[in-house]
Amino acid sequence: MEKLSANKIRQLWIDFFRERNHFFIESKPLVPQNDDSLLWINSGVATLKDYFTGKKIPPSKRLVNSQKALRTNDIENVGLTSRHHTLFEMLGNFSIGDYFKTEAIDYAYEFLTKKLKLDPKNLFITYYDGDDITFEKWKSLGFSNEKLIKGSRKTNFWDLGQGPCGPCSEIYFDRGPKFDSRGSELIKNEIENDRFIEIWNIVFSEFNNDGQQNYTPLKSKNIDTGAGFERIVSILQDGPTNYDTDLFLPIIAEIEKNTVFRYKIENYFLKEPRQTQINKSFRIIADHIRAITLAINDGVQPSNLHRGYIIRRLIRRAYWNGKELGISHPFLYKLVEIVGKTLDYRFDIPTISKIILNEEENFAKTLEIGYNLLESQLKINKNQIKPVTVFKLFETYGFPVELTKEILAEKNIDFDLSQLVEFQEKHSQISRAKKTTGMQKVINSLTQIKAKISDFIGYHTHHIETKISFLANKDEEVAETNGENLSYVIFEKTPFYATAGGQKHDQGWIIQNNSTIEILDVFKDKFLNNIHVFKGKIVKNQPVFLKLDTKNRLNLERNHSGTHLLFASLRQEFGSEIKQLGSDNNEDRLTFDFPLNRKPSDQEIKSVENRINSYINQKIKRKYLVTNLEEAQKLNAIMTLEESEYMDPNSLRLVIFDKITTDLCGGTHIENTELLEKFTILSCQSKGSGIYRIRAVTSWNKYFEFLKGKIQEILSKISALKNKIKKIEPNFGLNLPNLVDLEQQFDYLKKIEDDLRIYYKKLLKSQLRIAKSELDANKIIEIGKFSFYLDFNLPLHNLKQIAATWREQNPRISFILGANLVNNEFLIIVSSAILASNQILEKIFEIFTGSGGGNYKIAQGKIQKKPEKEVFIKLLWENITEF
């Protein structure tokens, strides 16, 4: 057995199967594309499902991959056991209707014994009882009955309850009695152990389950294999665990630079309790930073929702384990570069590091206060924890519920998780189900269509006489429509583009027997037929004339091509790793979603816009190229658009704007960039979770419409600013000239707005100077280890700004300020840098009837009357541990 590097082992796998005519599929992103059934790519075959179901045509009947995958369902075992990981790689070789059992077993045996030079004496095989072909094949390779372990339906038959299924055969490697004195009964009895390591599983998909447990042979038999990359590496590098390899040890060495503690491989056998805990923390950090790095690289931003919540949870769990190693400063971001060296993937190291550093800094700000709260509550409640405290730790201090549970488990303390169900649903539940739209129901109901019966000719043809292939009222095929309901038609040939790839469907008309009927919608069925929606009378057995609305098509093409140019410009501005998360192009405007770890500046957005307008001025011709997947990859074609999922890999359509971008796309596009006229970014807004959406238009008409709207917005802002200034300077006046040119008017009014805003801020600052010098030391009250400043006799005007200013100047003091309102009501403002202002306000409302809200730093509300200072002090003493 030769000791090989992880990268060498991966390459040996790929090369071995390429030499045997397998097409290599590169590892896909961890975020599933067009598959709402999965949160993450969690297996090697997950990205290939459409090939096995027939939804997409595979580039070859033989495939090989090395797919990164992510699972967090058993995260509590990560670092504790030898082989549990959040991020892992699966090596896979697949046959779709090509070779079957004999060849699959031959390939596995040859790779393990010839390429990796594993001793066959150390291999044990499981097989399904009754699968004689598999049993005899392994026996012919020299395996004795003692090495061939008979499995049951439970252990050696893959069946999801409906659809393709079949027996499987697993390959185990025996690491010897030093790992466990017991023998092969560990495999037979499914006992968890570190001696017999499952390294390969071959699934023979040869039956179809109709859902009623009736099994029939498949016409096309398939092979689906999975080999555990980290497990194979640990065996070849003789590491006691997966962590003791060149996939993890360089990361662990980098962690050691930040702590006095050391990771000790030999402790696997020594099992010294304190060192076991130390090793566990090192492993958790090393494991999690790999998952964090790859997930962020694939476009996931840490947040409190969906996938972002899981990544934030991993960051905070890793950071907490750093604290267990005595690391009291951000350090995870420093590990990104070494992760890049241990894995064979391209990373945007600076961007990923910044995102992680920001997360660490945010968590560090509240970690100590939150942990102190937890400790104090445990002391007060005699090692019992209230669900409300767990809730507060998450909402206020950013402790994931699961992390709190782990911390408590280490202290042998349990808490009632059932009372947190509503909270967890609100903050971290991930919905995987989407409502089926009415249109999808129509598609599903058109069961009469069994194949592709229509051709799209609309790239170059805008009108045609053709025949009807299919005609239906609702979900019932008819010879003639009644004209009363929405109806559906498929033509032999059609110039009408169906909604796909972010581009809206074409508009136009059906003409038959001097009757003109408007096209209302066009969508695709599962066979990629364009289904046209209309309302009117049509006869199936008579020809029809189809006429495209060319003006509408031009606007669609402008916005679709504009999307491609926008994507190219964004890559120029923010780096080649920028991702497209979604786009929507109709005749009026385009939208484009992309992830970024910060809000793009106005200057950056303007730079993106100017670059696109330079593309327009260059008058670059659009080209189309139809090629195969391999050639498209050589051209560095961008292959992230949705339409690529439905293309034949041997007939891919590329849209090319020379020296700008080459994209895989099935949509329609302008012939020359000059047809875009004028590219204008209307807005760039956050959608949350680090995702931004750009809205833009691509013609002069739409640009002028936009300008008129912006001018009205600016005039409203100028009016509001003028009114605010007049409250401070009653004699202030402003006259605006009437300019005809829209661009001149916009520029002039924008400058007026900016000048007024600056002037208003100057007026406010002059008022706040007084506030900055008036902090009265006699009004500071010490409650426990916290300081409060109480003043209920302040002027109403600018009270919120005064509260914010005092908080910034005195971050260790929490401010509770008040001022009289009309009708004897009283304004309360809470402002604090160290306690939850909004929760202090909630406690005030429990004593004094009122309403309001806010956030951690500042909150305000109204109560019925001016409170007594002594009541406030009593309230603070009684509730200080809750804030």
Swiss-Prot record:
Its cofactor is Zn(2+). Keywords: Aminoacyl-tRNA synthetase, ATP-binding, Cytoplasm, Ligase, Metal-binding, Nucleotide-binding, Protein biosynthesis, RNA-binding, tRNA-binding, Zinc. Binds 1 zinc ion per subunit. SUPFAM superfamilies: Class II aaRS and biotin synthetases, Putative anticodon-binding domain of alanyl-tRNA synthetase (AlaRS), ThrRS/AlaRS common domain, Translation proteins. It catalyses: tRNA(Ala) + L-alanine + ATP = L-alanyl-tRNA(Ala) + AMP + diphosphate. HAMAP family: Ala_tRNA_synth_B. PANTHER family: ALANINE--TRNA LIGASE, CYTOPLASMIC, ALANYL-TRNA SYNTHETASE. Consists of three domains; the N-terminal catalytic domain, the editing domain and the C-terminal C-Ala domain. The editing domain removes incorrectly charged amino acids, while the C-Ala domain, along with tRNA(Ala), serves as a bridge to cooperatively bring together the editing and aminoacylation centers thus stimulating deacylation of misacylated tRNAs. This is Alanine--tRNA ligase. It comes from Mesomycoplasma hyopneumoniae (strain J / ATCC 25934 / NCTC 10110) (Mycoplasma hyopneumoniae). The lineage of its organism: Bacteria, Bacillati, Mycoplasmatota, Mycoplasmoidales, Metamycoplasmataceae.
